[in-house]
Amino acid sequence: MTQPAIAEGVLAWTPARGPAPAAGSAGQLLVADSWLLREGRVRGFDRHRERFLGACAECGGGSPRRLVAFWQDMTAALPRTGAWFPRVELAAGTLELRLLLRHAPPLGSAVRVWATGQPDPRTVPRRKGPDLDTLAGVRGRAAGEGADEAVLVGPSGVVREGATSSLLWWEDDTLCLPPPRLPVLPGVTTGLIQDRARRSGIRIAHRERTVDELEGREVWLVNALHGIRPVTEWTGRPMKAAPAVRAAEWRTWLDELMEPLPGD
């Protein structure tokens, strides 16, 4: 597919004209979703579609026909060259659907994590969008401690996830993650990893752990942008990170899941 040069910016969508440069700012985000787009290829695109359209429907974001039409037009408008980190949005008030085009930031292969668990400040933890600004503040505080990410914890200190990432770890040969009854975002990348583990016969367990109990374990923070990032350093407290003996092979597998956008 040949496209003209595409610049960063916000495109507001209407059924009549499709995505077009937005005239003003949107209201508070009700729903958002984002993914890595590299040379027109993405992983788990159907899962992002399902999560975003389902969340929009729950928020009264329009009929299924309207939401599907937006997704189709949005997909056609995505760049087919370069590295991008697009975000789709549903705004409160007008229920406007938007596409935010932005270049992908530098990708990381490892992550430093603030070892002091942060109380989970989210108001809608199972839906991406409403709490993005609040979580950006948490990450900002982590950066002040020399870290890339922070771990959100519940009142009892049990870990939930990172500010912008899902949390997984290994206990011997068992892949572990927080129990689904906890208020965590259903991560697309986490779902892909769990599917591979099941196909490979790897045991998966949902366990409650504090940050302290992650010391000496191989811990991963995963999301749609960076993929799998093993924790190589805990900052702010004398915690040791385990060697990331599994991460490289799983990162290679995850990169190979990148597929062309539908219709290309």
Description of each model-found segment:
Residues W84:
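Non-catalytic DNA-binding core/recognition domains of DNA-processing enzymes
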Residues M1-A76, R80, A91-D264:
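Helix-start/capping segments and mature chain N-termini
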